[in-house]
C-alpha cells in the first residue's frame, strides 16, 4: 500500500499537456472524469469530433412525428468500447440518469434521451460520445506525477462550446497558460 494521498478527480477535467502527449487520441485532449477511485478511473474525451449522425436513424427511433433528420455531432470518448454511447449533458434533464455529478452535469445512456432530444424535449446542452477512457489502479496517478495532465474544475462552457478544435486552447487560457511558453521540460517542485 502506498503512503500517497489519494485525490478524487471525479467531476474534474483533465487537460493534456501540450508537449508531453504529442500524438494519438490524447494529444490536446480534454477529458471529463466520470469516476476516479483507488481502483481506477473512467473519463470521456469531449473535444474529439468524429462525425455527425441522424439520431432517428442511428437509434432506430420509430416515430412518424419526426420527419426531418435530427443531426447531432458524435465525439470519440476514448479507446475503450466504441460500441457504447453516452450523452454528457446538462442536469436540466434528469430522466433515467446513469450518473449525476451535482455540478450541473449528468450522463445518460439510454434510448429515451435520444428520443427526447429528437423531439426537442431533451437537455439544453448535450454531447453524444462513443467509447471512453479508462485507467487501472494507480495508472492515472502515475500519469499525473509525470505531468501528462493538468487538472481543472469542471467548466460547462468548455464542454459544450460549439468549436471542438478550440476547446483545448481555451482550457489552457483559462488555466493562465500560453502554449508557446509551455516547456516540454516539466519538473516537480
From Swiss-Prot:
Tell me the first and last residues of the signal peptide: none
Identify the InterPro entries for this entry.
Answer: AlgH-like
Q: Which Pfam families match?
A: DUF179
Return the GO cellular component terms, semicolon-separated: cytosol
Q: NCBIfam families per the record?
A: PRK00228.1-4
Q: Which family does it belong to?
A: Belongs to the UPF0301 (AlgH) family.
HAMAP family attached here? UPF0301
Protein name per Swiss-Prot or TrEMBL: UPF0301 protein A1E_00140
Query: Which species?
Result: Rickettsia canadensis (strain McKiel)
